């Protein structure tokens, strides 16, 4: 079983899968009589149909025990999905490129710094939220509308991957 190498999350490395939502290194302009920096358009919400809505939810996720066997990935073909951490804890992101099914050899893992969010582009394969330190809350921006917007792919036992933060140290 292949152990995923966990990479630091950067805009450049994550670009094939979506957007990194962070203020560090991002352009801004001043608003509210000069008292507020606006980091404008850090990500774009994608929806498939004009009648779809962009919605905001909060996910409260329990810590997952590591190492974790990656048995499945999911994708949202009708809209993007963004996760912004609310409590400042680092979390893991596991993704695979667009395609009919995720290719195990192309799966990548990233570690956020706790202040970075991610916006998965439409159709990008990803693992459900991976909280690693303690229970965590995420502001989630995604799509509401008709149609099935969640495809799941389960790997065969031979294709499964191991996510082990200790292996990177």
Curated annotation (Swiss-Prot):
It is an enzyme of class 4 (lyase). GO terms for biological process: allantoin catabolic process; purine nucleobase catabolic process. CDD domains: cupin_UAH. One of its GO terms (molecular function) is ureidoglycolate lyase activity. Pathway: Nitrogen metabolism; (S)-allantoin degradation. Signal peptide: none annotated. InterPro entries: RmlC_Cupin_sf, UAH_cupin, Ureidogly_lyase, Ureidogly_lyase_bac, Ureidoglycolate_lyase_dom_sf. Keywords: Lyase, Purine metabolism. Its EC number is 4.3.2.3. It comes from the Bacteria. It catalyses: (S)-ureidoglycolate = urea + glyoxylate. The keyword Lyase applies. Its cofactor is Ni(2+). Belongs to the ureidoglycolate lyase family. Homodimer. Catalyzes the catabolism of the allantoin degradation intermediate (S)-ureidoglycolate, generating urea and glyoxylate. Involved in the utilization of allantoin as nitrogen source. HAMAP family: Ureidogly_lyase. This is Ureidoglycolate lyase.
């Amino acid at each position: 079983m292949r152990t995923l190498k966990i990479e630091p999350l950067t805009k450049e490395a994550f670009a094939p899968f979506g957007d990194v939502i962070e203020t560090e290194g991002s352009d801004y302009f001043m608003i509210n009589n000069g008292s507020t920096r606006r980091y404008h358009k850090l990500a774009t919400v994608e929806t498939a149909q004009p009648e779809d809505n962009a919605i905001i939810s909060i996910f409260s996720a329990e810590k997952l025990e590591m190492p974790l066997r990656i048995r499945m990935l999911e994708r949202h073909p009708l809209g993007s999905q963004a996760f912004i951490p609310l409590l400042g804890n680092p979390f893991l992101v596991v993704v695979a490129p667009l395609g009919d099914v995720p290719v195990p050899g192309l799966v990548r893992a990233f570690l956020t710094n706790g202040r970075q969010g991610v916006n998965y582009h439409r159709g990008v394969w990803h693992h459900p939220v991976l909280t690693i330190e303690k229970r965590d809350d995420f502001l989630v921006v995604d799509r509401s509308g008709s149609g099935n917007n969640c495809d799941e792919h389960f790997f065969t036992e031979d294709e499964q991957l191991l996510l082990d933060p200790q292996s990177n140290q």
